[in-house]
Design a protein with these regions (language model features):
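Structured C-terminal subdomain patch of bacterial secreted/periplasmic proteins
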Residues: 210, 221-260
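Glycine-rich phosphate-binding loops that contact phosphosugars or nucleotide phosphates
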Residues: 1-100, 191-221
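Aromatic-enriched
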Residues: 106-108, 216-220, 237
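Phosphate-coordination loops involved in phosphoryl transfer and adenosine-cofactor binding
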Residues: 16-17, 134-135, 185
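Internal helical hairpin/lid segments
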Residues: 148-215
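Active-site phosphate/pyrophosphate-binding segments
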Residues: 71, 88-169, 175, 263-270
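Glycine-rich, charge-decorated loop segments at or immediately adjacent to ligand/cofactor-binding or catalytic sites
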Residues: 53-65, 178-181, 224-233
């Protein structure tokens, strides 16, 4: 849930029997800190995930987890992984989860899969960066758990860090309107699911290929994610969050636009 939405439209269930997990890279996102404070006031247990400690978030949350960040960080020690592990632990403690041990092992194994995938993906990533570097609009696509990474790529990388107009399209929503923008020059980036929603991605992909040859499909199943069996689809977001970094660094270099460049963010109050 968006932090500022939580502040202004707080779910009525929030109270002493609730755990609220918030996250901020620098720990100073005002809306996130405020949401944490609101949860505290309502009696909830609050857990803050942040890379920077001390920070306003670490000072506000009742419990703090400092996660790892960067190309050398271990996948299971990253922000999204900690959020996932917290949900997993709560589920197992409250209701029991028959695949708990398997999930813990799969999450630990994911790091090795990601490390190898980041090496294997380089040739395709270089080709993609040079082909897409001059596009003024790029649409990301995904479904199921992969919609999250596709959304993050659109708003945090293309729009925030590269100043490329972008929008995320859920593969299941593609035929409810968005498919009308498809032509031979439309730029698409799909993060394909290996799980239950893969048919949604395939349906959209089949249509796009009839009218377009500028869609790049990043498919985790080609890079070892299936070694995790039926649990793979739960862990795909962490896979894509890491592997897509190879693409992001390369397109930033190709466009001569560093990922750290900002016009407005952190420049003045807003």
């Amino acid at each position: 849930m968006n932090a500022n939405e939580f502040v202004h439209a707080t779910p009525k269930e929030i109270g002493k029997d609730t755990v609220v997990i918030t996250a901020s890279q620098r720990g100073n996102t005002a809306e996130t800190v405020k949401a944490t404070a609101v949860a505290n006031e309502l009696g909830a247990a609050t857990v803050g995930l942040t890379f920077q400690v001390p920070s306003p978030l670490s000072d506000t949350a009742q419990y703090v987890i400092q996660y790892e960040f960067g190309p050398e960080s271990v996948v299971e020690n990253q922000k999204v992984s900690y959020g996932f592990k917290l949900a997993l632990e709560i589920l197992n403690e409250e209701e029991g989860y028959e695949k708990y041990d398997e999930m813990v092992q799969a999450l630990a194994k994911l790091n090795d899969i990601v490390v190898q995938a980041k090496k294997d993906i380089v040739p395709d990533a270089i080709k993609w960066a040079w082909e897409f570097k001059d596009d003024s609009v790029i649409y990301t696509m995904g479904s199921g758990a992969c919609w999250g990474p596709a959304h993050q790529e659109a708003i945090c990388i293309f729009m925030e860090m590269q100043w490329i107009n972008a929008s995320v399209i859920h593969s299941g929503e593609f035929f409810h309107g968005p498919f009308e923008i498809t032509d031979k020059n439309t730029a698409f980036l799909m993060m394909k699911s290996c799980g239950h929603t893969r048919p949604l991605d395939d349906r959209a992909l089949d249509f796009i290929k009839k009218f377009n040859n500028r869609i790049f499909v990043l498919d985790a199943s080609q890079y070892g994610i299936n070694e995790l069996g039926e649990l793979a689809e739960y862990l795909e977001p962490m896979f894509y969050n890491n592997v897509i970094g190879v693409f992001n660094n390369l397109i930033a270099d190709a466009r001569k636009h560093p990922l750290t460049t900002r016009r407005y963010m952190w420049k003045f109050p807003y």
